[in-house]
Swiss-Prot record:
GTP binds at D66, L67, R68, G69. InterPro entries: P-loop_NTPase, RapZ-like, RapZ-like_N, RapZ_C. Displays ATPase and GTPase activities. It comes from Macrococcus caseolyticus (strain JCSC5402). The lineage of its organism: Bacteria, Bacillati, Bacillota, Bacilli, Bacillales. ATP binds at G15, M16, S17, G18, A19, G20, K21, S22. The keyword Repressor does not apply. This is Nucleotide-binding protein MCCL_0516. GO terms for molecular function: ATP binding; GTP binding.
Length: 300
């Protein structure tokens, strides 16, 4: 295959225990990779066969391998070379490491036991692991030193290496709900719009929802609605990039009115449309309680 883009992609994530392999795996998952952690190296050929037999869902795969599977670990480098020689899958090896004193500090902070720490000190276990991984580090296509990195900085490095401009690595979820049915427990930001005029008290609108033009126009015609909306949308445009910089893969914005049928639905629709035009992110809109009150709508 001459075009690199036609290859299926396999990223092998390995490196020092405690250096941040789990963070790297989670980030790759957010980038759209199918991720498997702690796969025994002996199973790599079977997994490659599975990738080749699956056209879509396994086109980009990340596999985490470390010394927890030490009985099989010695064969890892050989298995990787065999896969490269097959020329069927584009193989990249990400090696995550950190300095000895940083790893010691992290283990003490988390109170976890190093996988090689059998009757030896923590620092001896770390140094032994570094020796065992030396050859594998030598064949790595990418090496990240996380010694001076917080998790969000490590995520940024992984995105820089494996992401692309077309990868939707951040998702905006806009949800309408009714306070009488309870707060959405997964919301990051909640706004209360019960102070706006309520279409429920107008007979011809009572059984409609904010998706209906009659209700939508009624909610939007008020001066206080427009003032609130402009302030709200400016705030969201300011804070959403901050959520991404902090390493979050998504943000859930919840707009609530009394029943989740009229005002919150109309505002959620307008907010979704503007954010979708403003940001180059994946966006989903869901009206949680409109089914309870009347109708429901969910869209991407």
């Amino acid at each position: 295959m001459s075009n690199e883009d036609t290859y299926k992609r396999l990223v092998v994530v390995t490196g020092m225990s405690g250096a941040g392999k789990s963070v790297a795996i989670q980030c790759l998952e957010d980038l759209g990779y199918f991720c498997v952690d702690n796969l025994p190296p002996i199973l790599l050929p079977k997994f490659i066969e599975l990738m080749n037999n699956n056209t879509e869902s396994l086109s980009r795969v990340a596999i985490g391998i470390d010394l927890r599977g030490k009985d099989f670990f010695n064969s890892l480098q050989e298995e990787i070379q065999n896969i490269i020689n097959l020329n069927e899958v584009l193989v990249q090896v990400l090696f995550v490491e950190a300095s000895d004193h940083i790893l010691v500090s992290r283990y003490k902070e988390t109170r976890r036991t190093h996988p090689l720490q059998d009757n030896i000190s923590l620092i001896d276990a770390i140094q032994e692991e570094r020796k065992l991984l030396a050859d594998l580090r030598g064949v790595a296509t990418h090496i990240i030193d996380s010694s001076e990195s917080k998790p969000k900085a490590l995520r940024s490095k992984v995105i820089e290496i494996f992401g692309s401009g077309k990868d939707n690595i951040f998702t905006i979820n806009v949800m309408s709900f009714g306070f009488k049915h309870g707060l959405p427990i997964d919301a990051d930001i909640v706004f209360d719009v019960r102070f706006l005029p309520n279409p429920y008290y107008i007979e011809e609108m009572r059984k409609l929802t904010g998706l209906d033009p009659l209700v939508y126009d009624y909610v939007m015609k008020w001066k206080e609605t427009e003032m609130f909306y402009q302030k709200l949308i400016d705030l969201l445009k300011f804070v959403i990039p901050g959520y991404m910089r902090e390493g979050k893969s998504q943000v859930v914005i919840a707009i609530g009115c009394t029943g989740g049928q009229h005002r919150s639905v109309a505002l959620s629709e307008r907010i979704s449309n503007e954010l979708k035009d403003f940001f180059d992110f994946e966006l989903h809109t869901r009206h949680r309680d409109a089914l309870i009150e009347g109708t429901i709508n969910e869209k991407a």
